[in-house]
């Protein structure tokens, strides 16, 4: 390209005759006869190049009957032929050849070169087209509605190998193409139908003339194709009984093809009669023949059918005796004299013999011959058929490898059916009876005999019959019975039936399979109908509810137009019931059991069942109400429920938890007043694993202390104390010990038992002389008090918050009364000595607390409830009180420690819906009010407990705080008096519920 937009001059070279640079168009394009006029003395041979040919095509409009279609090869051939004729005419006339481009050779060559370079392929440009363009749809991505896009050019779209366009050929790019599948399913078992050989051009070995040779070969191919289609049709009719309904279309297509070819085969037979003379074929003649079921050329029904050479392409066929068409059930077996057979037309035999001479051996013929020999060996060697003692006998046949049948095509389809029945009925029949196996069950033998008698009673032996309502159940019984037997026994049973009924064994097996398939379909249909009725009953109510929800939704949507959260659209939700699930599972089970009989080849069980659920079951509901995945989910749910129901009867003996050893030995080792041991052993502590050892150690120490309790009587200690209480005031009318009113009110703990028998207060027992009886009574009262505290602290304790005698009233009204009424017994001259029994251990469930501060606060409050005794006698001051030291601080046994956490402010949270049913102590039933014991209610696992406390007092009240400080001082005095040398002796005798025993200090 020159600068400034100026055009550059180019030198053009003219095309000369000897230049081979433009071999694409030919150096002699302007001189067609140049090659012939070239001198012969040239050493190099002249290269013959192809000429450009101009083809003129006339396009016409496409209508419903025709459309323009051109074959380039044929057009090229016709054009060359036309050019050759014109050349011959011009040569004969002696006129010189005229070249259309003789005037402007250079211009034409230049234009052709430019156009070839611009629009040509790789030959002109020198580079090939990319392979990816071959697999690209050039019409992809264009806007069909755009008028600028030109879609009038025809091009070949990408079409899969297994598909073809609906009408075939090429299309203008307008819309999507419609395809049809080229593959056709076929379940036939015939060898020649499975192995499809391509048709080859066969050469004739003998021919009289070229015209007759061409016509005979064409007729031969037509006759061969017609007979093959006839054989395919006859086998497809037999196989259609065991195939599914989808195969009926294939059979109808083959029938139509066969009827069209019958006329062509009739023409070929007439040509053989008129034009050919050859050797007679060997004909086997016996005394029996099958009557013709259709007329010959005359159209009438003669009593006999001529027998020709026995050449079959399918299987060994008897040439003389055949069973009549029992589908019609009217034609009996008739005989034909041998004299009539001898007078057969010789032209038919000659035609058949000529076929054998003309045909060449192909791979297809060899395969058929091998197949025929195999079938013959399977059926066994046979003798010549004849009539003897009224029984049919087998006959040996001359098997030919020819592809034609015995002129069946000219007699119509009815005659072919009769011949097919004769072949099926006689080729494998038994010559002797087969005894039933002795190992068969009695019900199988009964079913076989019943079926034989039913067939014989109707005189249907040797006839292929259609099963009716009576015969179908009998055959089904036989078929189902032998399915569970050995293969050899099953073959013996059907061989016996074959001989008795004169019907082929495979025919009975096929009929049995058909009956079983129908039975399985009937079961599935019955179950599906039950489900349909149940759904029809439920659906009206479901639809009405859905419509109501829709109206409600419309009202809410209209009311809340500008709301941020619009109401949800109701869904079509079908409510399943146990009955509907059961019916659905019945349909699933019926389909599952029919898989072996109704499934197609290479179809899995899941595909088989899912197809039925999707196509049949889902359609029972209105559109949009049911999906396949929902059906599968309900079936799975029903399966799981069914398995759980089966496992339930076995579960109780296996899953029953054994009773703890401590609970079993409870009547002998521990009193029933304390339920702490059971609470410790049965459920594990919900704390971390580090507290397990502490829990076990504490429980063991408590069990040891409970075992050391005195067994005075078989009755519980509570009842014993109750009996001893009335006797004590009579023995000692003048008490020596007396509790302060405040202390008495503060520490009086009622022992709550199952019988609601309250034990006497400690002030009643302790205001008596210090004798052995007093010590025993004091010990019993202390045991009862300790058991009460343990009972209150146990997780399984059920308390009544409405009663006045409970643990929460310890520091409420009693404390206020004590602080308001000072003790009248305290004087200046009397020294108060606080004595008491050993403190009882209290077990705290650490799972109810989150921090150590709450645990310490609770332990101090429990320690404040220790029995406090005030002594007013001087003699009591010198009495030594023995107190056992314990590892537990203040009578509190810690069985586990949580990591400390920062105390959080109490925030009243919203009530939760759930209530955790964990093991909780009786102390954990406190509501939102931090009442008598000062717990933090957030530590408890109770949210919506209906049990609330009665009127309680706030511990922040100054009056209550003063009372608490007085109690604390009394506790300190009690501890000092207990460890002083002059403490009261004998207070520790008989105590069994205290802390672990240690050496007594005196």
Curated annotation (Swiss-Prot):
Keyword Aminoacyl-tRNA synthetase annotated: no
Residue span of motif Nuclear localization signal: 80-85
Predominant localisation class: nucleus
GO biological process: chromatin organization; female meiotic nuclear division
Composition skew (Basic residues), residue ranges: 903-917
Compositional bias per record (Acidic residues), positions renumbered to this chain: 218-262
UniProt feature, compositional bias: Basic and acidic residues: 408-427, 679-689
Biased composition (Low complexity): 207-217, 286-320, 336-358, 395-404, 653-667, 690-701
PANTHER family found in the cross-reference section: CAPZ-INTERACTING PROTEIN AND RELATED PROTEINS, YEMANUCLEIN
Name under which the protein is recorded: yemanuclein
Organism of provenance: Drosophila melanogaster
Lineage summary: Eukaryota, Metazoa, Ecdysozoa, Arthropoda, Hexapoda
Gene that produces this protein: yem
């Amino acid at each position: 390209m020159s600068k400034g937009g100026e055009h550059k001059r180019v030198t053009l070279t003219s095309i000369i005759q000897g230049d081979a640079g433009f071999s694409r168009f030919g150096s002699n394009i302007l001189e067609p006869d140049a090659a012939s006029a070239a001198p012969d003395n040239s050493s190099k041979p002249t290269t013959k190049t192809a000429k450009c040919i101009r083809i003129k095509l006339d396009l016409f409009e496409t209508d419903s009957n025709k459309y323009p279609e051109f074959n380039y090869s044929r057009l090229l051939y016709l054009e060359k032929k036309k050019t050759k004729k014109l050349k011959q005419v011009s040569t004969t006339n002696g006129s010189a050849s005229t070249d259309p481009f003789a005037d402007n050779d250079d211009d034409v060559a230049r234009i052709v070169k430019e156009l070839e370079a611009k629009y040509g392929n790789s030959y002109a440009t020198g580079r090939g087209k990319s392979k990816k363009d071959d697999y690209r749809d050039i019409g992809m991505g264009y806007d069909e509605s755009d008028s600028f896009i030109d879609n009038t050019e025809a091009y070949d779209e990408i079409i899969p190998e297994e598909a073809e366009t609906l009408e075939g050929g090429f299309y203008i790019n307008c819309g999507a193409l419609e395809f049809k599948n080229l593959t056709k399913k076929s379940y036939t078992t015939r060898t020649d139908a499975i192995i499809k050989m391509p048709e080859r051009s066969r050469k004739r070995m003998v021919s009289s003339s070229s015209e007759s040779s061409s016509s005979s070969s064409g007729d031969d191919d037509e006759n061969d194709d017609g007979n093959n289609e006839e054989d395919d049709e006859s086998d497809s009719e037999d196989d259609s009984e065991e195939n599914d309904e989808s195969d009926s279309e294939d059979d109808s297509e083959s029938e139509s093809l066969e009827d069209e070819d019958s006329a062509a085969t009739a023409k070929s037979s007439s040509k053989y009669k008129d034009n050919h003379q050859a050797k007679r074929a060997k004909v086997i003649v016996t005394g029996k023949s099958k009557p013709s079921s259709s007329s010959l050329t005359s159209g009438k029904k003669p009593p006999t059918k001529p027998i020709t050479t026995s050449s079959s392409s399918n299987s060994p066929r008897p040439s003389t005796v055949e069973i009549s068409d029992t589908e019609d059930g009217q034609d009996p077996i008739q005989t034909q004299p041998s004299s009539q057979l001898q007078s057969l037309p010789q032209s038919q035999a000659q035609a058949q013999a000529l076929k054998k001479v003309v045909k060449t051996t192909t791979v297809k013929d060899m395969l058929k011959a091998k197949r025929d020999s195999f079938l013959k060996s399977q059926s066994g060697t046979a003798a010549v058929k004849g009539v003897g003692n009224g029984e049919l006998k087998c006959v040996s046949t001359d098997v030919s490898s020819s592809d034609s049948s015995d002129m069946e095509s000219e007699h119509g389809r009815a005659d072919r059916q009769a011949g097919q029945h004769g072949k099926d009925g006689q080729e494998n029949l038994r010559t002797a009876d087969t005894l039933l196996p002795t190992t068969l069950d009695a019900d199988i033998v009964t079913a076989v005999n019943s079926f034989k008698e039913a067939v014989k009673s109707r005189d249907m032996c040797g006839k292929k019959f259609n099963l009716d309502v009576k015969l179908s159940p009998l055959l089904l019984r036989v078929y189902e019975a032998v399915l569970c037997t050995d293969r050899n026994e099953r073959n013996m049973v059907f061989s016996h039936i074959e001989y008795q009924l004169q019907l082929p064994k495979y025919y009975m097996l096929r009929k049995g399979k058909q009956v079983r398939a129908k039975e399985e379909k009937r079961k599935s249909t019955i179950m599906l109908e039950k489900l349909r009725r149940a759904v029809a009953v439920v659906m009206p109510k479901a639809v009405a509810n859905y419509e109501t929800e829709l109206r409600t939704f419309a009202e809410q949507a209209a009311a809340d137009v500008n709301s941020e959260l619009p109401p949800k659209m109701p869904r079509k939700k079908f409510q399943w019931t146990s009955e509907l699930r059961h019916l659905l599972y019945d349909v699933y089970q019926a389909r599952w059991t029919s898989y072996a009989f109704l499934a197609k080849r290479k179809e899995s069980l899941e595909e088989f069942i899912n197809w039925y659920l999707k196509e049949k079951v889902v359609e029972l509901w209105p559109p949009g109400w049911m999906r396949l995945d929902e059906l599968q989910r309900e079936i799975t749910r029903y399966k799981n429920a069914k398995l759980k129901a089966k496992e339930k009867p076995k579960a109780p003996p296996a899953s029953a938890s054994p009773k703890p050893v401590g609970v079993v030995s409870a009547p002998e080792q521990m009193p029933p007043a304390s339920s702490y041991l059971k609470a410790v052993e049965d459920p594990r502590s919900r704390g971390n694993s580090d507290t397990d050892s502490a829990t076990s150690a504490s429980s063991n120490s408590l069990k040891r202390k409970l075992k050391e309790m005195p067994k005075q009587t078989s009755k519980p200690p509570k009842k014993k104390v109750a009996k001893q209480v009335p006797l004590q005031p009579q023995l000692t009318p003048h008490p020596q010990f007396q509790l302060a009113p405040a202390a008495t009110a503060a520490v009086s703990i009622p022992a709550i038992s199952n019988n609601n028998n309250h034990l006497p207060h400690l002030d009643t027992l302790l205001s008596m002389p210090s004798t052995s009886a007093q010590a025993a009574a004091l010990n019993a009262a202390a045991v009862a008090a300790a058991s009460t505290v343990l009972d209150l602290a146990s997780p399984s304790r059920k308390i009544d918050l409405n009663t006045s005698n409970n643990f929460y009233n310890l520091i409420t009204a009693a404390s206020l009364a004590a602080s308001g009424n000072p003790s009248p017994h305290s004087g200046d001259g009397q020294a108060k000595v606080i004595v008491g029994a050993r403190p009882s251990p209290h077990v705290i469930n650490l799972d109810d607390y989150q921090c150590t501060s709450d645990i310490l606060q609770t332990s101090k409050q429990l320690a404040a409830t220790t029995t406090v005794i005030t002594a007013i006698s001087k003699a009591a001051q010198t009495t030594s009180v023995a107190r056992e030291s314990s590892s537990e601080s203040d009578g509190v046994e810690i069985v586990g420690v949580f990591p400390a956490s920062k105390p959080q402010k109490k925030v009243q949270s919203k009530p939760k819906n759930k209530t955790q049913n964990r093991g909780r102590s009786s102390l954990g039933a406190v509501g939102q009010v931090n009442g008598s014991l000062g717990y933090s209610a957030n530590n408890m696992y109770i949210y919506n407990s209906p049990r609330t406390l009665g009127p309680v007092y706030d511990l922040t009240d100054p009056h209550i705080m003063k009372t608490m400080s007085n109690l604390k001082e009394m506790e300190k005095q009690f501890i000092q008096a207990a460890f002083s040398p002059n403490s009261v002796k004998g207070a520790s005798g008989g105590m069994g519920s205290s802390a672990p025993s240690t050496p007594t200090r005196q």
